[in-house]
Structure formats: structure tokens, C-alpha cells
């Protein structure tokens, strides 16, 4: 039986195979953050001379890319990217996701918004019938912490400050358990509209375009309905 680490590697390798035909001297790839994205970055190193560069969704990923000699570009200097590749903490059959376990969801959303396609790479443990078992990360401007926490309680959540953590943007994370996520796009809009919220970890407006799900029987490919 494959370990979770081996499944993550399988998903990363599948993404590399999927993007290889797209590579070229003018191509820029968007790269996410997390343990599975790290494996994708490690594999991307062998293609570093076949693309113009990358845009990273976190300082962590930027450092890992640079460590492999892969060019990291500022998103402000990039007008288009064919793909953004990232993992997820949870994903459902509609390819809606919860992300932000690493606290990078704001930059992940920004980079993903510029890409033509979002490829999500996950192992089979991340596929769920309904989102919400994984607490929803919400990036919040520090002065709004209590006000946002009260609003999240009113929505049925149980927010907890992620102690000792500051985002790359200088903000805090509230991890919100107990939310009833029946309509992920609607909840994403509601939470993101709370004053003081930078963005939440729901990725449903839109979700991923393709999910490469690593299973004990190989890669299962899911497309957005």
C-alpha cells in the first residue's frame, strides 16, 4: 500500500506530465504552497531551462523555487499564465476547495486568478462529500480580530486564533471550525465581505478546473462540472 507521501508524489508527477507540453521559453507557471506543491516544485527543477519562470504564492515556495535555480517573477510583471498548480486541504466533487493550512490562501487566490487553468494536486484523503471538516482559515487584519470572530460565531463557526503565526501579508489567521458549508460559493462571498477579512480559504468562486487525485489504483482525474 502506498503511503500518503508516495501518493502526494504521484499527484505531483501527474501534474508535471500534464504541464510538460505547455512549456516553452515564454511560459510562466503559477506555483502554490504546501507539502504537495513542494514536491511539484522539486520535480519542476528538471524543466527550469524550458520555461521563462514561475510566480510563487508564498515566500516559502519562492525560496524553494529559487533554491532549485528556477526563476521567480513578480506577479506585477506577468500578464498571463497557462496554469496554476497547487494542493488543497479539502476538495469536493465540484472542485470547490478549502485551502490555507499553510496560511497562504490570499496570495494563492491572487496568483490563481491570473492563470488560465487551476490544477489541484491532492491525495485521495483530501476528497470529501462536503467541505468543512478541515477548519476554514480566514486571513484577518489584526485590528479586526474580535469583530470578525464575533461575525464568524454568528455564522455558526468556532473561530480560533492561529497562535504565533503571521501571514506573508502581515496579518493573522482565524481557523474556523463547525461551519455548515452547504453552499460554498455563497459562504465564500459572505465571509470575504466581512469588514477586516482579507480573504478566506474557500476556493469556490471558482474552484479548480482539474483535480489530479492520487489513489492506491493510480491517478483519478476530475474536471469541474
Swiss-Prot record:
A GO cellular component entry from the record: cytosol
GO biological process terms, semicolon-separated: D-ribose metabolic process; pentose-phosphate shunt, non-oxidative branch
Residues the entry annotates as binding substrate: 33-36, 86-89, 99-102, 126
Active site: 108
Metabolic or biological pathway, per its Swiss-Prot or TrEMBL entry: Carbohydrate degradation; pentose phosphate pathway; D-ribose 5-phosphate from D-ribulose 5-phosphate (non-oxidative stage): step 1/1
Alphabetized GO MF terms: ribose-5-phosphate isomerase activity
One Pfam family hit: Rib_5-P_isom_A
Keyword terms: Isomerase
Catalysed reaction, written as an equation: aldehydo-D-ribose 5-phosphate = D-ribulose 5-phosphate
Record-listed E.C. numbers: 5.3.1.6
Superkingdom: Bacteria
Gene3D superfamilies, alphabetized: 3.30.70.260, 3.40.50.1360
Cysteine pairings via disulfide bonds: none
Family label: Belongs to the ribose 5-phosphate isomerase family.
Assembly and interaction partners: Homodimer.
NCBIfam families listed in its UniProt record: PRK00702.1 (NF001924), rpiA (TIGR00021)
Role of this protein: Catalyzes the reversible conversion of ribose-5-phosphate to ribulose 5-phosphate.
Entries under HAMAP family matching the protein: Rib_5P_isom_A
Record-given protein name: Ribose-5-phosphate isomerase A
Amino acid at each position: 500500500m502506498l503511503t500518503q507521501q508516495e501518493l502526494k508524489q504521484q499527484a505531483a508527477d501527474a501534474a508535471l506530465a500534464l504541464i510538460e507540453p505547455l512549456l516553452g521559453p515564454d511560459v510562466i507557471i503559477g506555483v502554490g504552497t504546501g507539502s504537495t506543491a513542494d514536491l511539484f516544485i522539486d520535480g519542476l527543477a528538471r524543466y527550469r531551462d524550458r520555461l521563462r519562470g514561475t510566480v510563487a504564492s508564498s515566500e516559502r515556495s519562492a525560496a524553494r523555487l529559487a533554491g532549485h535555480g528556477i526563476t521567480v517573477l513578480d506577479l506585477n510583471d506577468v500578464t498571463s499564465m497557462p496554469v496554476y498548480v497547487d494542493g488543497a486541504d479539502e476538495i469536493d466533487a465540484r472542485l470547490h476547495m478549502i485551502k490555507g493550512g499553510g496560511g497562504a490562501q490570499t496570495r494563492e487566490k491572487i496568483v490563481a486568478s491570473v492563470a488560465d487553468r487551476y490544477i489541484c494536486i491532492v491525495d485521495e484523503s483530501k476528497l470529501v462529500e462536503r467541505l468543512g471538516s478541515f477548519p476554514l482559515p480566514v486571513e484577518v487584519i489584526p485590528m479586526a480580530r474580535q469583530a470578525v470572530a464575533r461575525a464568524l460565531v454568528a455564522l455558526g463557526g468556532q473561530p480560533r486564533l492561529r497562535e504565533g503565526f503571521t501571514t506573508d501579508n502581515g496579518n493573522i489567521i482565524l481557523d474556523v471550525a463547525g461551519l455548515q458549508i452547504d453552499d460554498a460559493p455563497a459562504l465564500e462571498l459572505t465571509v470575504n465581505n466581512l469588514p477586516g477579512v482579507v480573504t478566506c480559504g474557500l476556493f469556490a468562486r471558482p474552484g479548480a478546473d482539474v483535480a489530479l487525485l492520487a489513489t492506491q489504483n493510480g491517478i483519478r482525474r476530475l474536471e469541474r462540472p
